[in-house]
Amino acid sequence: FHGYLERNWPPATRNRHLRGYRLSVRNMLRAHIRAHKHIHEIYRGKGWTPDARVGIALHFMDFAPSRPGKKRDRFATWLAEQLFQDEPSMAHARGHFLPPYGFPHRYNNFPEGSGDFTDFVGVSYYRRFRVRFHPRGRIVERPDSSAPTSDLGWEIDAEGLRRVCEACHESLGKPLFITGN
């Protein structure tokens, strides 16, 4: 995310269609699914019990529209949630790759097969992200200037951790572990 969209970390590139970002996320998703299958095959093949618990730790943000009364900000917020959280977590868990990580009608959206590919979810939550629509289609953060912030300037919102955990559990139905806060 940071390397392709914000250019903060390697590869520090951006292109119009986010091709590099999509491909890197798609490759990470496929690697997780393959590792999950392989680890479980090894455990079952050796008769080891209890079976391995293979999960994912994902960075979640509590996305909120900067201006809740503006349809454009609400849409940009929904889009940010889909791209950054919902679609990657569903692909990890179920193997279903939705756009932009999957390609409807042209390719198989279950490149590693459909199934249940995570046994738990690690939730790393650090901030609330207030989204403001940008006419060029970028996802732009507009923090609430009155909200408390961390040393990194990120908006602190303890209730956001609860909201993120509830949404994650509702969509995936997996045990949750707080892996970062």
Write out the residue ranges for each language-model feature.
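Active-site region of glycoside hydrolase catalytic domains
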Residues: 1-181
